[in-house]
Structure formats: structure tokens, C-alpha cells
Amino acid sequence: MRVGITLACSECKQRNYMTTRDKKKQNEKIEKKKYCRFCNTHTLHKEIK
């Protein structure tokens, strides 16, 4: 079952990206390095509820 998640910037805490993931196959939280328009740089984005 795929569920929607939000990715937030680890530096400024802005919620920049929405994506989905499969809860059965992936138990750990997602962390991706993506562009943050508020920080104006690439930062680590972590999954939040």
C-alpha cells in the first residue's frame, strides 16, 4: 500500500516536496538530497508526517 509523505528541509524546516512510498517494502524513513528554494542550495530533506 502506497502512502503520501512530505519531505522537509533539514536546515530551514520548510516542507518542499510531496512523494509516495510503499510502507510494506520500506520501513525506514526517506532521506534525499534535494534543492531547497528557501535556502537556495541543495540540502538533505527528511520524511515527516
UniProtKB/Swiss-Prot annotation:
GO terms for molecular function: structural constituent of ribosome. The keyword Glycosyltransferase does not apply. One of its GO terms (biological process) is translation. Pfam families: Ribosomal_L33. Belongs to the bacterial ribosomal protein bL33 family. PANTHER family: 50S RIBOSOMAL PROTEIN L33, CHLOROPLASTIC, LARGE RIBOSOMAL SUBUNIT PROTEIN BL33C. This is Large ribosomal subunit protein bL33. The lineage of its organism: Bacteria, Bacillati, Bacillota, Clostridia, Eubacteriales. The gene is rpmG.
